[in-house]
Amino acid sequence: MNHESQQQFDPENAPAFERLRDRRRAKRRRVLRVALTLFVCAALLGGAAYYAHRQIIKPYLDTPVSAPEQPPLPEPDPAPEPEPAPEPEPAPEPEPEPGQSALTEAQATDATKTLDLELYSSSAVLVDVQSGTVLAEKGMDEKIYPASMTKVMTLLVAAENLPDLDATFTMTQAIIDPLYLAGASMAGYVNGETVTMRDLLYGAVVPSGAEATEALAQAVAGSEEAFVAMMNEKAAALGLANTHFMNTSGLHDENHYSTVREIALILQAALENETCAEILSAENYRASETEQHPDGLAMTNKFLYRVHHEYSLGGAEITAAKTGYTAEAMNCCASAGKTPDGRSVICVTANAWTGEFCIEDHIALYTKYCGSAEAEG
């Protein structure tokens, strides 16, 4: 075994051995410090490079894109203040167009009597025509179904649009049958009967004939639908906001309605037409002779007949009337009359249980508010 390559521990050389070992340890520490220093420097250099790179990228990530700034626009010159416009002179009241009316609804006053238990009818109005005021009322603006009071408007529109009352119309079964089946009141004209326009007008009002109103509608407008449109146009021309018609006779329809105050205005407009006033005032009428009625069809306004022959109105007088009835409308009537001193009045009632109650309400209103104590006595 070769022992020359290995150093042996010699106690006599111990100090020298310790010094050699210390030098080796010091050398290793220096090497470690240098390596550590190099590592730290490398880390610092890497961090600086990363920071510089982030500062280059960050503005593109964090800064919002915005439009380039525009130079401020110059402020506009203040607009000159407009000169005050001269106040317009009030326009003159327009004249009513043809077909329109200057009539207005009667208005209530402090003197208007409010009726309640003294009437059978649930709605009523008594109007002084000359002053345009309401003398007495009960629910005058409540919705009603006008039933055959509708025929006052039918009469008015037909009379205004018939150039020749002697022109004729031939009655048809197609007109008669549906109305008969609906329970409408009839004048009595029959299929194939040739009737003058005048006789149709009387037949629509005096006996309240629904076949006469349908014939008038066809003669004037070509159909009932077209004629009803004319009726609603007339209502609008009169300023009636609570009236709408669906047919010419007053057969019940939920969309066929009015109020007693507006029916009063329709009657007032009709009475200003000479032909209508004559027909609404007729107690009896006999139509022209025809093949089917050789003596002419006889007609009677039963309401006028009764009030003229069975009642006293305290000096007042009922001069015109049109009644109506359906199960929904019950008994109603629009009448016109005169006070003892000659003033014109209009009375409309609706929703009385019987025809007798309807008549009694008109008698009571004319007697109490239009008659005189001297005449009653």
Predicted regions and their residues:
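N-terminal Lys/Arg-rich, disordered targeting/topogenic segments
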Residues: 1-32
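Penicillin-recognizing serine hydrolase domain
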Residues: 2, 109-111, 115-119, 123, ...
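Structural motif marking the loop-to-transmembrane transition
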Residues: 24, 28-36, 146, 193, ...
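Hydrophobic membrane-insertion alpha-helices, especially the h-region
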Residues: 35-48
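N-terminal, intrinsically disordered, polar/charged segments of Gram-positive cell-envelope systems
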Residues: 56-117, 126, 131
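Active-site-adjacent loops and short helices of periplasmic peptidoglycan-processing enzymes
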Residues: 95-261, 270
